[in-house]
């Protein structure tokens, strides 16, 4: 997992609330077994509309998504997070996230940042007025800066540390590889090992 400390990038203003995981990545994309290649399916039904914001060349290469409240509702599918990441997003800023989506995002290195609705609105308006507007998501300081806005956000210390170290569940476990090897060596030979 890629470490996240401070990220500065342009943003895509998605003026929609209650965006569910089926809208983020439709179910026909869930047949894939790898984690890459999902960017093409991101919001694919909406992207069929030429006026959809992701189709605007002014937002090409943006790495931050500005979303309405209740982003990531619906079924639990890590594919939604993988699609956002594969498209190039490092962070999503919203007034509220579905709990399961938030957990999946944090577990995969996509930073879901909860900000007051008026802050998200101010950032969205600024990006709509000037798509070259850059926003900084500073996990070290737990702060978002851009377009004259400075807003703090909450994230527990352990999750923050994991993101800053680039550790998903597997990476965290592998930090204890030597302990695991010692433990397995002390067990009867007929028991399974990780090697």
Swiss-Prot record:
Pathway: Amino-acid biosynthesis; L-leucine biosynthesis; L-leucine from 3-methyl-2-oxobutanoate: step 2/4. Its EC number is 4.2.1.33. SUPFAM superfamilies: LeuD/IlvD-like (SSF52016). One of its GO terms (biological process) is L-leucine biosynthetic process. It catalyses: (2R,3S)-3-isopropylmalate = (2S)-2-isopropylmalate. It comes from the Bacteria. Transmembrane segments: none annotated. GO terms for molecular function: 3-isopropylmalate dehydratase activity. It is an enzyme of class 4 (lyase). The keyword Iron-sulfur does not apply. Keywords: Amino-acid biosynthesis, Branched-chain amino acid biosynthesis, Leucine biosynthesis, Lyase. InterPro entries: 3-IsopropMal_deHydase_ssu, Aconitase/3IPM_dehydase_swvl, AconitaseA/IPMdHydase_ssu_swvl, IPMI_Swivel, LeuD. GO terms for cellular component: 3-isopropylmalate dehydratase complex. Catalyzes the isomerization between 2-isopropylmalate and 3-isopropylmalate, via the formation of 2-isopropylmaleate. Belongs to the LeuD family. LeuD type 1 subfamily. PANTHER family: 3-ISOPROPYLMALATE DEHYDRATASE SMALL SUBUNIT, 3-ISOPROPYLMALATE DEHYDRATASE SMALL SUBUNIT 2-RELATED-RELATED. Heterodimer of LeuC and LeuD. This is 3-isopropylmalate dehydratase small subunit. It comes from Parafrankia sp. (strain EAN1pec).
């Amino acid at each position: 997992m890629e470490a996240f400390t401070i990220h500065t990038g342009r943003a895509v203003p998605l003026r929609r609330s209650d965006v569910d995981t089926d809208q983020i990545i439709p179910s026909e994309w869930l047949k894939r077994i790898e984690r890459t290649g999902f960017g093409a399916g991101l919001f694919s039904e909406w992207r069929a509309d030429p006026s959809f914001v992701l189709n605007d060349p002014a937002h090409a290469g943006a790495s931050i998504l500005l979303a309405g409240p209740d982003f990531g509702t619906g079924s639990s599918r890590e594919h939604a997070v993988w699609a956002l990441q594969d498209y190039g997003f490092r962070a999503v800023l919203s007034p509220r996230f579905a709990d399961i989506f938030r957990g999946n995002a944090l577990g995969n290195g996509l930073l879901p940042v909860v900000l007051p609705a008026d802050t998200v609105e101010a950032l969205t308006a600024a990006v709509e007025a000037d798509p070259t507007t850059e926003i900084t998501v500073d996990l070290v300081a737990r702060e978002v800066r851009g377009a004259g806005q400075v807003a703090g956000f909450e994230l527990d210390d352990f999750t923050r540390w994991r993101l800053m170290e680039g550790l998903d569940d597997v990476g965290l476990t592998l930090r204890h590889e030597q302990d695991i090897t010692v433990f397995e060596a002390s067990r009867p030979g007929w028991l399974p090992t990780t090697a």
